[in-house]
Amino acid sequence: MADQRSKTNRWNWEVSGFEPRKSSSNASFAESTGHRTTGPLLRRNSISTPSLPPKQAIASKVNGLKEKVKLAKEDYLELRQEATDLQEYSNAKLDRVTRYLGVLAEKSRKLDQFVLETEARISPLINEKKRLFNDLLTAKGNIKVFCRARPLFEDEGPSVIEFPGDCTICVNTSDDTLSNPKKDFEFDRVYGPHVGQAALFSDVQPFVQSALDGSNVSILSYGQTNAGKTYTMEGSNHDRGLYARCFEELFDLANSDSTSTSRFSFSLSVFEIYNEQIRDLLSETQSNLPNINMDLHESVIELGQEKVDNPLEFLGVLKSAFLNRGNYKSKFNVTHLIVSIHIYYSNTITGENIYSKLSLVDLAGSEGLIMENDSGDHVTDLLHVMNSISALGDVLSSLTSGKDSIPYDNSILTRVLADSLGGSSKTLMIVNICPSVQTLSETISCLNYAARARNTVPSLGNRDTIKKWRDVASDARKELLEKERENQNLKQEVVGLKKALKDANDQCVLLYSEVQRAWKVSFTLQSDLKSENIMLVDKHRLEKEQNSQLRNQIAQFLQLDQEQKLQMQQQDSAIQNLQAKITDLESQVSEAVRSDTTRTGDALQSQDIFSPIPKAVEGTTDSSSVTKKLEEELKKRDALIERLHEENEKLFDRLTERSMAVSTQVLSPSLRASPNIQPANVNRGEGYSAEAVALPSTPNKNNGAITLVKSGTDLVKTTPAGEYLTAALNDFDPEEYEGLAAIADGANKLLMLVLAAVIKAGASREHEILAEIRDSVFSFIRKMEPRRVMDTMLVSRVRILYIRSLLARSPELQTIRVSPVECFLEKPNTGRSKSTSRGSSPGRSPVRYLDTQIHGFKVNIKAERRNKLASVVSRMRGLEQDAGRQQVTGVKLREMQDEAKSFAIGNKALAALFVHTPAGELQRQIRLWLAENFEFLSVTSDDVSGGNGGQLELLSTAIMDGWMAGLGAAVPPHTDALGQLLSEYAKRVYTSQMQHMKDIAGTLAAEEAEDAGQVSKLRSALESVDHKRRKILQQMKSDAALLNLEEGSSPIPNPSTAAEDSRLASLISLDGILKQVKEITRQASVHVLSKSKKKALLESLDELTERMPSLLDIDHPCAQREIATAHQLVETIPEQEDTNILEQSHDRRPSLESISSGETDVSQWNVLQFNTGSSAPFIIKCGGNNNSELVIKADARVQEPKGGEIVRVVPRPSVLVNMSLEEMKQMFVQLPEALSLLALARTADGTRARYSRLYKTLAMKVPSLKDLVSELE
């Protein structure tokens, strides 16, 4: 059955119903065809048999093959040379780019050096500014006293305080014994109850600036209980106190003064003093905080300090410290709370490291009265508070009076604040008082205490002293302004240098992207050259095989040659006998005509356009018998021609039905809703007519239906028929023929063979064979056009085959509307003919294919009356019954056919009509137009059998044949109209393809990637689209047969893809960054890291962050998110000393649980087979899990049957570094036996080497572990 099916499906040259014409050439062709069907499939020469001797033809064929092999070798060597030149050119380009990058790097280094030098010049100015500001504050006084009164509550009675000025406060003592019961106090600043926290802080800010400049500053909140001390320091939720405002000011000033070489850092310590004992409020909850030592002369106390990087962290730490104090409010009144902000400044240029401290002190209540009912503990607490506050007053008094000995040791409070009270330190005391008359005595006591500290300051009542200090302050301000101006200029210069550095970095990024693009182009060209080289090698191999086949066939051809000669001799004799019979018949007919002419006086003309032999009038019995014989012979010959036409029409109908099937599927939803489509047009039996059909305007781009007949570099299926036709068309040489008649005969035979091959291929394979012989057919037609020897009707049929094949595969071409046939026909002297019912239908709105006006073809037919004798003869022959009918003669039909041919030459609109309308439908429309416009040719019930219907058929056939012949005629310097239409349709398809690629690339370029997987998908998708676009461009450049390229330039505009290329370069850079982040995350997947390792990982993440400017803005979030996640992961891993990590690494062994309980979820397994020389090879399946670990699946034991597979995570080769051989064997027990057999050796070193090679071999088969393999290497 298989042999029978192969015989039935074998391709052969037989055409059903086709018999060759009875001539010498056709006879030989028929005989050769008969031999070909019975014998094996042989390759025929395109040269006709009588043209050259057989031996000479075979020798020429062999020589031609040798020349082709030689040309193929030369092409191969040229391609190799081009590849070498391209490689050298790429290397030279890369060298130039590398040198240019070096120059840019040198410029960047110089800019960095210049920035450092500029900052080195700015640093002294900044220090001088700080010194001047500190001198200004010193000139105003190192110790300042502010007074603040809180608002009066409702139940506290009247107020006893007045505010006569900004520096004076007046207290009504209500002492009638005194002449002036009011007592005045002067301070540096006095704040009434209406003053808020912001106004108070505006005067405190210079002390904060001094602390940042390097001076120790202490701010003391002093006063009686419930006077507002704690509110001044802490504030409320909506009006913050000095704690939060001081740190925010420090943070903002540090940010504005920090540079690339200088940096500020802050840490916080919070403690309280109760009964002369220090209690750390931070170390109670966090034991791992770094400590700071406080030297208290007699002892050293360690306090915990926590680093804070922003105001939110500061408030959080401060809140946790306050929570540690507890809820004993009575205890708060006898406790001193101290919040110390430690300020660290470092400069890498000058090597300067500065430490300063800002102490914010909330002192205990100052009432100091001991009641009789107070307990012993409370009395002790009050005594300690009075002692510490008194000692603080003594220290301030000694400092302001200039004494040599300062009593710091009298209290733990003064010892703690010793470094912030004397020398160049700045001290601010804020006295908080209550305006109520109930607390008058405590208020006066607080004011006296504060006045004692302030009155020791040099008196401001001396005008000379005031003038002196004002002059000093004025000079200091002027100098400070000059320094600030110079500092501002230098900062502007630094900004300009940073901008220049940024421009240089941008140039580096652009150049880097260009280098990547050059690498990509070079890689693409190399891959293309490699593929072309492989194709040439395959072609060379095929040529060798064909050459060997031809040599084997030479012997068979020699045997067939003798047989063909004998057959030709027999055919020649038969032809001569037939020609003799025809001559006798013609002489008999001539005698009969002459005898009839003598009787009637007028000769009759023939009405057959295909036969040159006239028909005799039925006069005698002999002439009628001769006429019948001639008619039988002519009918046989015409039947053969009609069969070939019918086969061609069936082929055209199949192509049209296929294209209509595709378009009907697209149109099915819209046919019901369209009111302009008439049912008569939809239900016609033969496809669609030339009338306008509402097709969709745009195809579905997602389906990718835009294809050409041949797709560039796509491999086309080959068939024996296609190979034979390709060779015959390519090898056809007109120079080998003698005379134009021989050339025309050979060329037309080849075109007929093309049509016959497509017919035999059938509807399922007609597109394949058309694509296979496409280049050869178009080259053959282009080569033969200048000689004007081809049958233009055959050329038209071949062109229509290819255009309809293109229409069937291109939905956007099916939307083209063509003009109806009425636009191409008109009656003489009347302009346009009356339109048919189809043309005048109100629902029809045709859209013309061309914008220019279509000139119609004038059908010149006039009604004439015959003479009486002709009418009698016609009645005798039974041809006509009406003497008024039009006499359509052969001459008239030939003239009309010639005029139709001239009209069709170069007419692209008519070509579009032929392409989009089936031939049978088009001829039917022409017959209908003729019947409607020439009434004397109309068919009635009386003359159906008389032949009038035959006249309409003859006229429509003559017009159709003339148009078909004219459409295939070339118009120098252009090709024929159908060829021009094919070129234009191909350009439309290419334009749609390029725009489709542009739209897809634009959509992908605008899509934002969320993670590494989407980045990889986007990159591969953009690279795929770019590769397809380049393939389309290459196909356009090489497809000269369709596009008719001039001087190698592309006729299709190439849309700009700069944005898509930039996004692709950005995705490539982003992919590299994400791979490095993934590698860092993998290295950080441990429990403990060494300090050096952790520092190296963090530096690597910082370097990746610096590479982010090379990415587009759309890719920044993804990179920032991945880097931030990795940075947070590394930061959370505990660190140890390098020595501890090394000791642990020596003791580290892979646990059995880590091997058996690791993650074994693998998406895809890769199978490897190891042949060890035994009967059964080892089969191991390998894959990768989400942790980038190698996972294998194999039989637990080699000798066990299938089904006992186990899955294990394979440890890395580095695990075996410090293992002994026995320990390795124990580890391999948990792994499949095949792995241990392949890896174990006699020694430990040999086992490590074999295991490392085996691990690399397995990992190379897993795509996700290729980076791991490169790391191991």
From Swiss-Prot:
It holds the Pfam family Kinesin. One of its GO terms (biological process) is microtubule-based movement. It comes from the Eukaryota. PROSITE patterns: KINESIN_MOTOR_1, KINESIN_MOTOR_2. Residues 142-456 form the Kinesin motor domain. Residues 59-89, 466-511, 559-595, 627-657 form a coiled coil. Part of the phosphorylation is not CDK-dependent. Residues 1-52, 827-847, 1136-1157 are annotated as: Disordered. Widely expressed. It is found in: Nucleus; Cytoplasm, Cytoskeleton, Spindle; Chromosome; Cell membrane. Residues 830-846 have a biased composition (Low complexity). Disruption phenotype: Impaired chloroplast accumulation and slow avoidance movement under strong blue light. Double mutant kac1kac2 exhibits an increase in leaf transmittance and a partial defect in nuclear avoidance response under strong blue light exposure. One of its GO terms (molecular function) is ATP binding. One of its GO terms (cellular component) is chloroplast envelope. SMART domains: KISc. Keywords: ATP-binding, Cell membrane, Chromosome, Coiled coil, Cytoplasm, Cytoskeleton, Host-virus interaction, Membrane, Microtubule, Motor protein, Nucleotide-binding, Nucleus, Phosphoprotein. ATP binds at residues 223-230. Kinesin-like protein required for chloroplast movements and anchor to the plasma membrane. Mediates chloroplast movement via chloroplast actin (cp-actin) filaments. Required for the chloroplast avoidance response under high intensity blue light. Mediates redundantly with CHUP1 the nuclear avoidance response under high intensity blue light. May act as a mitotic kinesin. Probably involved in division plane determination. Belongs to the TRAFAC class myosin-kinesin ATPase superfamily. Kinesin family. KIN-14 subfamily. Homodimer and heterodimer with KCA2. Interacts with CDKA-1. Interacts with AL1, a geminivirus (TGMV) protein essential for viral replication. Interacts with LUE1/KSS. This is Kinesin-like protein KIN-14A. It comes from Arabidopsis thaliana (Mouse-ear cress).
